Amino acid sequence: MSSTEDDRQVRISKIAGRYLVFDIDDVAYIRRQHGICAVFTGTMPQNPTQNVFLGLPLELYAEDAKMLLDRKVAYIADDPLEHLTQLKSMDDETRKSYLQSIKTQRRTAQLVFNEAKAQSMAKHKDKRKPKQPQPSVVVPTELPLSASSADGVAAAVDQEEEGGAEFLLESSSSKPLKTDASTPPQKPLVKEKLPAITPTTSNAMISNGTSNPDVENHTALPLYSYLNERGYFITPGLRFGGDFSVYPGDPFRYHAHYMANSYGWDEKIPMLDLVTSGRLGTAVKKSFLMGGQKPATEDSEAGELRAFCIEWAGM
């Protein structure tokens, strides 16, 4: 892990009770270093009904946010309040700095575009159809001319030279010559035209804060942390009938192995729930995992967490 990632603080924006990450670098960091996938929720304004490929922002579980806070690699910001406060108190220097950062991003986008265009042109250069070779000109051998034909050719040449001279005189008289041919014509100054961009974050305008609003403590947090610490990746499990879908590695590489539910230590679990969850897990080729943590007492803190897997063997 690089030193920049060691000092990295992920900004989690709390908006309307949801925990969102807008920076793509933060998204890559928490996925690569902390095994957190979460869910992309962004969509395109031109096509809001599409639900196949979603983009930024990334919405975190409350368990994700709490776990990152406990590891001291993130902070939670009250986004609406911070933006309103910063916009009201922004001075000229901060505003110029923000505009300069936007211009830098536009220049970077232009460089990336130019590089991609050059690579595309070089790639397709060899695929273009080669030009057909020009037919060679055959110079006829000199033939002896008769006196009459020689006189005719000489007259035609003299007439062409006279016409050319007359044309040169007419052109020179109608158009004045340039006094200084070595001086190139000056081109008008063109203002640098950069591509327009839409910033995905406002980090350049808002400084890194340390505000950490309270994160509601869910009962599923112990099981969630237990699985994450053992290298499992967790995604929503509604489509498989559980609270979580549990993967042995990155979901880009593996199928889910478990559908998981969290229960309280003393919570009564109906037998029908065990049967239906076990049968459902087996039907979708997964094991049903359930777990709970022993609560804290006066003599000890929150203790061990126990997890069990159930498979329906009669199908």
UniProtKB/Swiss-Prot annotation:
Q: What class of enzyme is it?
A: lyase
Polar residues composition bias: which ranges? 170-184
Catalytic activity as recorded in UniProt:
pretRNA = a 3'-half-tRNA molecule with a 5'-OH end + a 5'-half-tRNA molecule with a 2',3'-cyclic phosphate end + an intron with a 2',3'-cyclic phosphate and a 5'-hydroxyl terminus
What is the species listed in this Swiss-Prot or TrEMBL entry? Neurospora crassa (strain ATCC 24698 / 74-OR23-1A / CBS 708.71 / DSM 1257 / FGSC 987)
Report the family membership. Answer: Belongs to the tRNA-intron endonuclease family.
> Which biological process annotations from GO are given for this protein?
tRNA-type intron splice site recognition and cleavage
The UniProt GO MF terms for this protein read: lyase activity; nucleic acid binding; tRNA-intron endonuclease activity
Q: Which gene encodes it?
A: tsp-4
Region span, Disordered: 117-138, 169-188
Q: How does it assemble?
A: tRNA splicing endonuclease is a heterotetramer composed of tsp-2/sen2, tsp-1/sen15, tsp-4/sen34 and tsp-5/sen54. Interacts directly with tsp-1/sen15.
UniProt-recorded name of the protein: Probable tRNA-splicing endonuclease subunit tsp-4
Enzyme Commission no: 4.6.1.16
Q: Which residues form the active site?
A: Y247, H255, K286
Instruction: Note whether Transferase occurs among the keywords.
Output: no
